[in-house]
UniProtKB/Swiss-Prot annotation:
<feature type="transmembrane region" description="Helical">
    <location>
        <begin position="6"/>
        <end position="26"/>
    </location>
</feature>
<dbReference type="InterPro" id="IPR022791">
    <property type="entry name" value="L-PG_synthase/AglD"/>
</dbReference>
<feature type="transmembrane region" description="Helical">
    <location>
        <begin position="310"/>
        <end position="330"/>
    </location>
</feature>
<keyword id="KW-0812">Transmembrane</keyword>
<protein>
    <recommendedName>
        <fullName>UPF0104 membrane protein MTH_1261</fullName>
    </recommendedName>
</protein>
<feature type="transmembrane region" description="Helical">
    <location>
        <begin position="149"/>
        <end position="169"/>
    </location>
</feature>
<keyword id="KW-1003">Cell membrane</keyword>
<dbReference type="Pfam" id="PF03706">
    <property type="entry name" value="LPG_synthase_TM"/>
</dbReference>
<keyword id="KW-1133">Transmembrane helix</keyword>
<dbReference type="GO" id="GO:0005886">
    <property type="term" value="C:plasma membrane"/>
</dbReference>
<comment type="similarity">
    <text>Belongs to the UPF0104 family.</text>
</comment>
<feature type="transmembrane region" description="Helical">
    <location>
        <begin position="254"/>
        <end position="274"/>
    </location>
</feature>
<feature type="transmembrane region" description="Helical">
    <location>
        <begin position="275"/>
        <end position="295"/>
    </location>
</feature>
<feature type="transmembrane region" description="Helical">
    <location>
        <begin position="231"/>
        <end position="251"/>
    </location>
</feature>
<keyword id="KW-0472">Membrane</keyword>
<feature type="transmembrane region" description="Helical">
    <location>
        <begin position="36"/>
        <end position="56"/>
    </location>
</feature>
<feature type="transmembrane region" description="Helical">
    <location>
        <begin position="124"/>
        <end position="144"/>
    </location>
</feature>
Amino acid sequence: MKHKGAILIVIGVVALAAMILIIGPGEIEDALRKADPVYVLMAVVLEFIILALFTLRWSITTRAVSIDVGKRHLFPMLLVGMAINNLTPSARGGGEPVRAYMLGKYSRASMESAFATVIADRGLDTFPFIFLAVLTIIGIVLYFDLSRWILAALIASVVIIVVAFFLALYVSVDRDAGERITGWILGVVKRFYRKNHERLERRVRSALHEFQSTMRMMLKEKNVLVYGIPISFLIWILEIIRVYLIFTAFGTDISLLVIAEVFILATLIGMIPLLPGGLGAVDGIMIVFYSYAGVSPSVSAAATVVERLISFWMISAMGVAAIPYFGSSVSEKLMDKL
């Protein structure tokens, strides 16, 4: 792991530790001891079901472009990508090129086609995100007494993400739009890269055309949307239920709507490329808002610790452990990303 990444993880852990100290380690420990292990185990099992659904959704996009790779091989690629997202300050996007790289290496598909399947897979998440984001904004107005500035910032961030998604989708499938964006980027590159820029331009335009062709092929494949969108909604619903099970383990009754609201807020915070996986910041947001919703601070902190152990640390550990699966040459490159 690079020194910068390790330092940022330490900073995130220290921030979380500071919040635990403020709340009271003894109270949090008491809450953890009272947790029902059956519900915690159910939350862990549910996380594996969620991972299986993620793998299934990605396999739909790979099949749409005739990339022949089994789910048992996609699964470790998914885990490694998630680990990269969690352990690097990359706005939860650093793992996607890694997934594409591994898919291309394993299936011998072009990098452009492999990357298109990853982009489409992540894009399917946008539909439930928009729905839950609207619910979150409504819920915050009704349940939380936040300043107008915070509410405006939340609305603005959601709008920016939605606009960016549809703009990226437009550029991905429209040849003229892609050419204009590519031309602008190449114009900037030419100022600094004067050697063989004609060759570079040919390679970039060729890669763009293949990427766009693959994206259009997937959008024409009805299974991508017919099955991909419902699976995406199911994944988000199950993630909310997972958090609900954890609170149930602590004997706390909490609204699923409140969990959804905090989940969206935590997702937005996690996208800020400051700390790996929003470590510290996401935990803090979850603890503060659950407490604000009426859950005791000690239970909020204990539930957040358990939730992050399952959804962050367990997944990260599994992803790192899966890296040797792809051989030494790939492993060395992947470890450089951490």
